[in-house]
């Protein structure tokens, strides 16, 4: 989704008591990263970033350790990454990323949320050309020389660096996630959130009234236990 709308959503979420929903989602991301790439954070950049994101959201260390331990357990749930595409009210495009041990439940819930809130689920692949997948790092504001930092990170795959009143956002091709993650750590930058995000190629502006309609769907999606992230083409 566009940066302006992203900040609006972040500000709104900060006012809600979402910890009861957030911690299980962070734990699930840690568990999946550990299962896919190993339980040693030093050898697994996705796990390092998942842990850093959890810490930035004040998730207790015991919860983090438990999530990693579950990944290596014999009885660990088979959690799958699931991807859905759809349209919200007023034609806004939506990509939904889920992690679930029960895809049948998840697809039923996602379809119901779309249909009850003025949207529809599309065939996967329908929106591929409308978005570009990027490695995106949300960091605490940087007090140093941004041009120098940009030059230092280009060799690691940096494509865009943007700082606003709230944070520093660094992005690159999705294949550069590991290299950028390591370079950011080397620079001592403070990570708030990192992952692979879908960035709209042509963001679209909507009126306040239209955004209110669209956000009803987005709120319901983000409240679902299996939904990890929601991306839109809203500017």
Swiss-Prot record:
It is found in: Cytoplasm. It comes from the Bacteria. GO terms for biological process: regulation of DNA-templated transcription. Keywords: Cytoplasm, DNA-binding, Transcription, Transcription regulation. The keyword DNA-binding applies. GO terms for molecular function: DNA binding. PANTHER family: TRANSCRIPTIONAL REGULATORY PROTEIN YEBC-RELATED (PTHR12532:SF6), TRANSLATIONAL ACTIVATOR OF CYTOCHROME C OXIDASE 1 (PTHR12532). This is Probable transcriptional regulatory protein CJJ81176_1187. It comes from Campylobacter jejuni subsp. jejuni serotype O:23/36 (strain 81-176).
């Amino acid at each position: 989704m566009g940066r302006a709308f992203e900040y609006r959503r972040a500000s709104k979420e900060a006012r809600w008591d979402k910890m009861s929903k957030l911690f299980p989602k962070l734990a699930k991301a840690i568990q999946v990263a550990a299962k896919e790439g190993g339980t040693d954070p030093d050898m697994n950049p996705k796990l390092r970033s998942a842990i850093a994101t959890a810490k930035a959201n004040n998730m207790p260390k015991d919860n983090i350790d438990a999530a990693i331990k579950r990944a290596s357990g014999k009885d660990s749930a088979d959690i799958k990454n699931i991807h859905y595409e759809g349209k919200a009210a007023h034609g806004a495009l939506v990509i939904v990323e889920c992690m679930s041990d029960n895809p049948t439940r998840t697809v039923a819930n996602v379809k119901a949320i779309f249909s009850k809130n003025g949207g529809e689920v599309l065939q996967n692949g329908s929106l591929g050309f409308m978005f570009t997948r990027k490695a995106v790092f949300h960091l605490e504001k940087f007090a140093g020389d941004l041009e120098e930092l940009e030059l230092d990170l280009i060799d690691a795959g940096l494509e865009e660096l943007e700082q606003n009143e709230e944070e520093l956002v660094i992005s690159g091709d999705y294949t550069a996630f590991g290299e950028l993650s390591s370079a950011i750590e080397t620079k001592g930058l403070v990570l708030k959130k990192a992952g692979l995000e879908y960035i709209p190629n042509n963001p679209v502006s909507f009126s306040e009234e239209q955004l209110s309609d669209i956000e009803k769907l987005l709120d319901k999606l983000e409240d679902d236990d299996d939904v990890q992230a929601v991306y839109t083409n809203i500017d």
